[in-house]
Amino acid sequence: KGYLYWGDSPWCAKVESEDAAKCTLFPASRLVTDSKRELLESLTAAEKAMVRSVFLTQPLPENAAGATLLLPRSFVEDGLMTQAEQNAMFKAVAAKYTAGPLFIKTHPRDTTDYHALFPDAVILERTMPSEVLNFCLPFKFARAVTVQSFVLRAFTAADEKILLSLEEAQALLN
């Protein structure tokens, strides 16, 4: 019969959703609420440390008070600018919005050398899902900043979330 995606297979008895009441793709009788958020929030400190150890290749700084998280994406890979233009733009974004220690969570497709661009920043592994930041770090960021990305929509690990358009970020270069 060909490829049947998601819960469309006749052999699929139920479809799990974070919140079945908000899902409109399937009838309510086929849906089950299974909140991963609640599961992750219920982890003990030791369990969270174990999850961190999977993704972190270096220890976290002792003091992360007032930390800013920059979540860049690759505009170079998307053909929207050169590497030099992207580097300059993210340096300008970081200069304007960083307060306290700077953490950078790179996008999996982004091959930029953020260690070279921001030698004092804590660079989180590109293989770490950004969702892990919501529950596994022992602190909350004061601010999270991204450019033309939806990554902050479900992000809960920052007191302030700043979503810049590409035009707003590029304007910081002037």
What are these regions (language model features)?
Residues Y3, K14, A21-L31, A116-P129, ...:
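Active-site regions of enzymes building and remodeling cell-envelope glycoconjugates
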Residues K1-A67:
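A nucleotide-sugar donor-handling region in carbohydrate enzymes
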Residues E131-L173:
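A donor-sugar binding/catalytic signature common to diverse glycosyltransferases
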Residues T82-K96:
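Well-ordered, non-membrane alpha-helical segments in soluble/globular domains
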Residues T98-R126:
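Catalytic donor nucleotide-activated moiety binding site of glycosyltransferases and closely related
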Residues L39, L43, P72-A84:
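Surface-exposed cleft-lining segments at the edges of enzyme active sites
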